């Protein structure tokens, strides 16, 4: 007796690709609606010198949530200039005071380093995604209606290599109103979460009742 043949339909169903999970579909939709903004971080870029006498630098980029900022480091091709004439930068994220004074010690932290001006594969590129939430412990979260600041470390010869700085404004979304810019670092004395703040406030009437009894 011939062996029974297995139905082909279940086998064909196993070969069909599975649909992506919901979070993957949301990520793809956000990527499709995002824009990319390029910044060429070198002293020859005239946008770094626009309005330099007003607030310490007029280079401003406006982005929306889920947009990308691409930083392109200085790059040199053959014939290479002398090593001392190549631009090297350490980029920091700072608060408003650090941006105005071009001082990375004003509550700033190192973000990227442009240290390969003669890289054979082209200029170094660093990308910042302006997202509300990040799954990475070392990632940074951004808020609509806020300003964020980037500067490069001031070199010893400030005449030959002026300070470069950038202001990024995150546009408010339809669900948010404009909020005044705040420092990129929050105080350790503030509540770490809305739930914790509500819990603390809810205990105040109980404490007053116990003290008055």
UniProtKB/Swiss-Prot annotation:
It is a lipid-anchor; GPI-anchor. Glycans are attached at residues 42, 174, 188. One of its GO terms (cellular component) is neuromuscular junction. GO terms for molecular function: ephrin receptor binding. A lipid is attached at residue 188 (GPI-anchor amidated asparagine). It is found in: Cell membrane. Residues 189-213 form a propeptide. The gene is EFNA2. CDD domains: Ephrin-A_Ectodomain. PANTHER family: EPHRIN, EPHRIN-A2. Disulfide bonds join 73-114, 102-163. Keywords: Cell membrane, Disulfide bond, Glycoprotein, GPI-anchor, Lipoprotein, Membrane, Signal. Residues 34-174 form the Ephrin RBD domain. Residues 1-24 form the signal peptide. Cell surface GPI-bound ligand for Eph receptors, a family of receptor tyrosine kinases which are crucial for migration, repulsion and adhesion during neuronal, vascular and epithelial development. Binds promiscuously Eph receptors residing on adjacent cells, leading to contact-dependent bidirectional signaling into neighboring cells. The signaling pathway downstream of the receptor is referred to as forward signaling while the signaling pathway downstream of the ephrin ligand is referred to as reverse signaling. Binds to the receptor tyrosine kinases EPHA3, EPHA4 and EPHA5. Interacts with EPHA8; activates EPHA8. This is Ephrin-A2. GO terms for biological process: axon guidance; bone remodeling; cell-cell signaling; ephrin receptor signaling pathway; olfactory bulb development; osteoclast differentiation. The lineage of its organism: Eukaryota, Metazoa, Chordata, Craniata, Vertebrata. It comes from Homo sapiens. Belongs to the ephrin family. SUPFAM superfamilies: Cupredoxins.
């Amino acid at each position: 007796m011939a062996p029974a043949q297995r139905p082909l339909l279940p086998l064909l169903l196993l070969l069909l690709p599975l649909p992506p999970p919901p979070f993957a579909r949301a990520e793809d939709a956000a990527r499709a609606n995002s824009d990319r903004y390029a910044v060429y971080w070198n002293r020859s870029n005239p946008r770094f010198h626009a309005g330099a006498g007003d607030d310490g630098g007029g280079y401003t980029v406006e982005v929306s949530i889920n947009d990308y900022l691409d930083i392109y480091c200085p790059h040199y091709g053959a014939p290479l200039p002398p090593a001392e004439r190549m631009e090297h930068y350490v980029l920091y994220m700072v608060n408003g005071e650090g941006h105005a004074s071009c001082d990375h010690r004003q509550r700033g932290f190192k973000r990227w380093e442009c240290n390969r001006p003669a890289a054979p594969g082209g200029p170094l590129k660093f990308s910042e995604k302006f997202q509300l939430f990040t799954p990475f412990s070392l990632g940074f979260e951004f808020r609509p209606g806020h300003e964020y600041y980037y500067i490069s470390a001031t070199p010893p010869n400030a005449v030959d290599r002026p300070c470069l700085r950038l202001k990024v404004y995150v546009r408010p979304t339809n669900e948010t109103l404009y909020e005044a810019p705040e420092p990129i670092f929050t105080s350790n004395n503030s509540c770490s979460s809305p739930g914790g703040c509500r819990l603390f406030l809810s205990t105040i009437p109980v404490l007053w009742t116990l003290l008055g009894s």
